[in-house]
Amino acid sequence: LTQRDLSVLKRKEELTQEQKDSIAAVQRIEEEAYETAKEEVDAALAYAPNNALFGSSSYRIPFPTGLWIYNALVGKKSRFAKWLFDTFAGTPVFISTVNPKTRALVAQNTLRNYGYFNGTVDYEILPEKNPKKAKISYTVRPRNLFRLDSIAYLRFPAVGDSLIRETFRQRTLFSGDPFSVINLDAERTRIYNMFRNSGYFYYKPEYITYRADTIQRPGFVQLQVVPADGIPASANKRYYLGRTTVNLFNNDSYELTDTLQFRDYTLYYDGGKKGKIPLRFGALRRNLFYRKGMLYRQDIMSFVQQQLSEMNVFSTVNLKYVPRDTTALNDTLDIEITGILDKPYDGEFTTKVTSKSNGQIGPGLSFSMSKRNAFRGAEKLKFEVHGSYEWQTNSTVQGHSSVINSYEYGTSLSLDYPRLIFPGARKFSRRAK
């Protein structure tokens, strides 16, 4: 609320529609923030007591049979007593186990994480008539909610500052919103991803910090987003992609005896006696959506990792980035791709029983054999043999000839190709240049 809004609260007849909307918006924001904080505080304080109902921290079963059995049979040695104890006894919940002091402290910190900086959480142990029993009472006082006032991004390098301004509409922090560490973490993650997608390979989330002032304007937070102190020089440098090395291992051999050079790519593989590459370079190259000299981008390289995994020819595949050299002037990362080819063959045997509405019932069998990377282009060739037999179990016509039994058998051959073959569609295959 502005000072003018506060001054007219007692004179409702003087409120304009704009002021009413402003007050309603603030109330709605505070109610939502309160419900969110309440849910988190309840979770921090919740602990199922003795004879809890379905694990509830508030509702209990009237008769604590679990505790009765525990008290009656604890320490008994007979086999039946041990079985009864293990099956039905309930472990007693002690005050020391609940640790109300720590829970109250956690709940109080939770309030502050959601903008209730003056909030407090106290607890009291309430003894009952039975000296062995007690209850815990928590008192939560959230008090006033702090909201964001000014938000400034300071001390970032010139390029980083320009990137922040270009993506300003994507921010998660807005003036007037309740203070929330969830939103702070979301903004830190957003800035981190922005830097990583703009060439800053060594940038980390912890390089982004916050400074907050709650004194200048009561009830509000003057927030500054600043880089952390002591950031290494490599984190403030943009990196470009260099040469690519591919280590292609067979599933039964970890030797690389052959080499293939193609422009900026070097492939090491085991060609065996025939010297053939186990996976054609073209099939691999189609999934490398980058080129030499391109600025490093985390989103594109993550997509490359995903596409290589989805080729379904590797048991494991990973990307490694190696600095061209260790000098301060270096700004190039070479890529090293290491993949281990999966076993070439898969077999599957399936049985089934079918029952139809026309009264036919019977078993079915199928066996399929698949070969990965069948033609060294990430294809999958599958051959299947199947058969089934069905009996008619009911017939409205008398006589042996009225019963109709049927059988089916056959084979199928399929080829899964990792790329659509369509004239003129080549330009669409490199969708992430």
Question: Locations of the language-model features?
Answer:
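Gram-negative/organellar outer-membrane beta-barrel architecture
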Residues: 163, 277, 297-433
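Interaction-mediating elements
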Residues: 1-310, 332
